């Protein structure tokens, strides 16, 4: 009945859907709410093998922590958790990862059959996957700061944290969790954070559809897994082409020790190739050091 249709339309409007009414023509969907809803994300993944493995939650301590708990319980390859609110987001070496409201915080479980040393390039490939997803939704392909940040306008848009669990007997990888946090909305942040932070809304002038962005991440990360061992060279070439660290003079930070070098490129495992002032060359693994530009964050 008309009354039942109107009641449904009214309910959808209350939930944030933009619905236009036209006399004698009915209703049209003008916009969907900017919220991270499991059904909305899955709707963008029709027919995808990971569609039913993706779950959005209102809030979580850390999406990486959530996926690690699920992985320990036997959750399958492709299981993903996403949210707009992390209460205890983590970065590399246990640092706090600032998770402003309006962002997208996403982690996925991968089950590669490999030794840990065979996954040294995983974070670099994850950076490419995240950049491709951002491009698919916004039309902007971010720069990459070696090895785990995406950058817009010299400021951090996205951070990536990869963690692995090891089987005790075989010493092979039981699971890998890839965590990606993207600043989507323009929000007020403390000055010391704001000076280094970018958002898609601030850069493009439009808020991204986070459900679409989450679905794009799922697709990109599934493609990553398929290319992890047999197609990595093309992914690493893409990484190098967009890596703003390459060609820069950089600071290499190992705890309290700071050294200076010139970043020449990356090798086949995504280690940073550097030349020190005395002419010595080396390959620096991402787990060993943090890299800072000489003249700012990037």
Which ranges hold each PLM region?
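N-terminal lobe of the biotin/lipoate ligase/transferase fold
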Residues: 1-136, 156-158
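Catalytic beta-strand/loop module used to bind and position nucleotide/cofactor moieties
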Residues: 77, 83-85, 93-103, 107-298
């Amino acid at each position: 009945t008309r009354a039942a249709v109107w009641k449904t339309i009214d309910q959808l409007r209350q939930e944030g859907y933009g619905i236009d009414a036209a006399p004698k023509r009915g209703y049209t969907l003008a916009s969907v709410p900017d919220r991270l809803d499991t059904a909305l994300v899955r709707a963008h993944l029709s027919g995808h093998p990971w569609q039913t493995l993706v779950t959005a939650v209102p809030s979580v301590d850390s999406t990486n922590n959530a996926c690690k708990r699920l992985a320990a319980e036997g959750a399958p390859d492709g299981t993903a958790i996403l949210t707009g609110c992390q209460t205890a987001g983590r970065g590399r070496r246990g640092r706090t990862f600032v998770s402003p409201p309006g962002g997208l915080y996403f982690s996925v479980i991968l089950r590669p059959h490999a030794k840990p040393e065979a996954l040294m390039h995983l974070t670099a490939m994850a950076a490419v996957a995240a950049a491709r997803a951002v491009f698919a939704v916004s039309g902007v392909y971010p720069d990459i700061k070696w090895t785990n940040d995406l950058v817009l306008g010299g400021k951090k848009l996205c951070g990536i944290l990869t963690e692995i669990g090891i089987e005790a007997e075989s010493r092979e990888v039981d699971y890998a969790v890839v965590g990606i946090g993207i600043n989507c909305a323009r929000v007020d942040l403390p000055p010391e954070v704001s000076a280094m932070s970018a958002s898609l809304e601030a850069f493009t002038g439009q808020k991204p559809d986070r459900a679409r962005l989450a679905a794009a991440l799922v697709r990109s990360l599934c493609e990553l897994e398929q290319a992890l061992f047999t197609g990595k060279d093309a992914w690493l070439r893409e990484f190098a082409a967009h890596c703003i660290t390459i060609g820069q003079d950089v600071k290499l930070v190992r705890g309290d020790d700071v050294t200076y070098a010139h970043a020449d490129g990356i090798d086949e495992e995504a280690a940073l190739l550097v030349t020190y002032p005395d002419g010595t060359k080396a390959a620096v693994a991402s787990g060993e050091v943090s890299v800072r530009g000489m003249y700012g964050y990037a």
